[in-house]
């Protein structure tokens, strides 16, 4: 298999014969170039595709990869494996310095005893809920962009409101402007003690305020149960102030 398909002219014939016309018309087979089909995952475990070719698009504006895998026994999850190889090829393309993802066309060469090939070649059909998978993987992914959500709307977000308010305003020149809002959100008892402690430490370490002690006191008015923690932080701020002075 590899002796044949690693030969450029043979690979050109194979793709010209077996690629659907709609895909073939976007490929410039004259620019076909054999690539390494070995990939290494984050856990350093290597995996290999059979054949990987790169080529320019017919318009010359981008790159297309043809990933050819051969199989003698049907595999229910073959399309998922092909997707893993395809995404690995995309990542390698970016690692080379390209700014846009290439289209990777997986092609399965099957020569098993069972005929015809018994499984769908649509990888979405591998999911227990193909309809949901199609909605997730063929549309835009959900986006929680807090930069465009109003503070009033964020204030209604129950246990996530403190986190969203912090992250939205952490780069403000003075966090004092949202101290009251944060204090009220913390007082609603949606959050765990660990979450509130982490929030206070984060605000004072990563945020900016011209009056850090007043900021602490404002929060303390709403969450007096954290007085000990607040006083510890306030004492630290006083010491830092003396050192800076």
Enumerate the language-model features and the residues they cover.
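Elongated, amphipathic alpha-helical interaction scaffolds
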Residues: 1-244
């Amino acid at each position: 298999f590899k002796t044949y398909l690693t030969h450029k002219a043979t690979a050109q014939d194979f793709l010209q014969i077996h690629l659907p016309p709609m895909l073939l018309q976007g490929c410039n087979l004259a620019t076909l170039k054999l690539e390494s089909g070995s990939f290494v995952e984050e856990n350093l475990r290597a995996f290999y595709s059979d054949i990987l070719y790169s080529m320019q698009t017919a318009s010359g504006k981008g790159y297309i990869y043809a990933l050819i895998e051969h199989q003698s026994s049907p595999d229910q999850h073959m399309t998922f494996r092909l997707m893993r190889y395809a995404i690995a090829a995309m990542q390698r393309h970016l690692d080379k310095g390209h700014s846009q993802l290439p289209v990777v066309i997986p092609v399965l060469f099957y020569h098993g005893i069972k005929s015809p090939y018994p499984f769908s070649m649509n990888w979405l059909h591998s999911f227990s809920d193909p309809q949901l998978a199609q909605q997730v993987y063929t549309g835009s992914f959900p986006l929680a962009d807090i930069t465009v959500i109003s503070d009033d709307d964020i204030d209604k977000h129950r246990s996530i409101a403190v986190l969203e308010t912090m992250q939205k305003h952490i780069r403000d020149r003075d966090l004092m402007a949202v101290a009251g809002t944060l204090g009220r959100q913390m007082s609603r008892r949606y959050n765990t003690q660990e979450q509130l402690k982490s929030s206070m430490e984060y605000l004072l370490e990563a945020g900016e305020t011209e009056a850090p002690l007043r900021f602490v006191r404002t929060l303390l008015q709403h969450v007096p149960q954290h007085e000990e923690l607040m006083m510890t932080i306030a004492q630290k701020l006083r010491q830092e102030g003396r050192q800076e002075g």
